């Protein structure tokens, strides 16, 4: 495989486009390819129905088929999937006219065209305080016996990260199957693998993208010594829960992830008996009753399954989140303290530090002519080094300064420079990305630098008639005290779907993460790994950590595990100062949520905020959803007129999001003691300007494990002190000895 093809494989994953995707069959899920009729006017619709009364699971397909218009029954069967666990309904190929006719059936709640959603480590375990044979890894048996279900692009089963040496057989509850054939496929590590995006050329759940292999090994990869990419980030690659089992559900391909396949994967995973679901994918914000991941996740938590999802890569814009439902752990991305360092050195002696994975040893450090790509390009896209935008006469043999953005993938910019004869590339961040360069596997000598450094390079180019530069490659450096830092791409809150719930919930490692890859990037014979970035990478870190907690505390609910993760999170970096964002200023709660995950502390949180599935009913009715819309989520008939509605902030969540106008708001929370039997917690509050807070009681005294106590907190507006600010943030901590149970608070001023 050529280097260009390899890089295309990588970028097709990261910048996946939203276009149509084929569906696939599964056990207990019906699938028919429509080969004998014109499909040009057919689209896949997701159909939600009222919960059938007293009907056997095996009869569901027949029941759903009976609802279809007669015009669909004259040719091949149109039903793509039938769902049994996470939603009441099915996916079907219809014309717009047939969909309209179907919606006239009183058993049908809704029928809408499906959307296509997009895909959103040698060092991270030690960065997070996980050590072999010690602490949480020892106490949780490294996740032994826990099953992590991963919905992604498939998996490469031959990779040593998925060796089952020394692993036990799957637990007796496991009900899944393996669709791989031949030898060395599923084993006691990969215990299940299904494909829901079958095509004529690819029917098995092999990973033809790379994303699924990377996320699976991040969550639960086995130790592999000598892991590296081009000699960088060398060490032992291991996942968060190395002894957990993996079940892969292939729901995505090169072009994205169809809603019908996602629902089919989640439906099957629940039936199979997974303990944790990990989804590094998502779509735009929308109401929960139209969100396939929110729907599937609610069905999962009803069965005690923890669900972790990526927050999306649309930052740093506010309200850019995916996967906002309160029953999902929404994970943003942060940096780690490892840098794959490269330096841009200018002819005036100044140096600007950046990052690059590709660090050729044969690149001479001598100065070369430096040119700005936007100076004499072929079109307006030359500044972004778009393909065929550069003149060979301008860039041949030179170092080319390119700008990030312009809808041109970073590695493709380097290819454009190389194709035009350029010797090297210096890539400067956009103003939004600022101080947040990313290490990429470039196709030529390159370095990614900050926006500020890029401005300095532009100024230098304009100051002399003979600007020169070179790139110094300095390898892997550990110990950046600014880590963790919120990445520029990590999506921010507040939530659009539910502004009264603070999102994201947590941040975790998502920048320059090394993990398993299906193919070698440098044609070496060593096991292939790759370094990529995204909230897709942070999500499986948290999924693996949840698996550790599930083993350590098998009686904890999904909400209790989430609470433990959130209330023990860190708000400071390795240097002991507040976590920063891409601008090198303190990150706000809409970027960090509760803070950066601390797995060791999460294993012993002291107190937890628990939520039962039925507790969400008054919350959902409080969102002013109709009875039918709430029923789609709950998979049961609901009459909100008979339910006590609650405000979003009244949900027993481990954080607060307060939409504060001119009146005082009072909310209650209940905490359960999971620490020492006899313990007293004292409240500490951090109150921002423009708000007053009062708490009752100010102390909580427990006498037994499992005991629950309730407190109330009032938020009082002081509008004259706000200085025209639109939001503020504070915190509430319950402190007892070594325990500090912290809830972040966001205030949105109305």
From Swiss-Prot:
Residues annotated as the enzyme's active site: 152 (charge relay system), 211 (charge relay system), 536 (charge relay system)
GO biological process, one term: response to symbiotic fungus
Record-linked SUPFAM superfamilies: PA domain, Subtilisin-like
Signal peptide span: 1-24
Inducing factors: Rapidly induced in roots during development of arbuscular mycorrhiza (AM) upon colonization by AM fungus (e.g. Glomeromycota intraradices).
Domain annotation Inhibitor I9: ranges: 44-120
Primary residence: secreted
Effect of loss of the gene: Decreased fungal colonization and impaired arbuscular mycorrhiza (AM) development during AM symbiosis with AM fungi (e.g. Glomeromycota intraradices).
Name of this protein: Subtilisin-like protease 3
EC number(s) on file: 3.4.21.-
Keywords: Apoplast, Glycoprotein, Hydrolase, Protease, Secreted, Serine protease, Signal
Gene expressing this chain: SBTM3
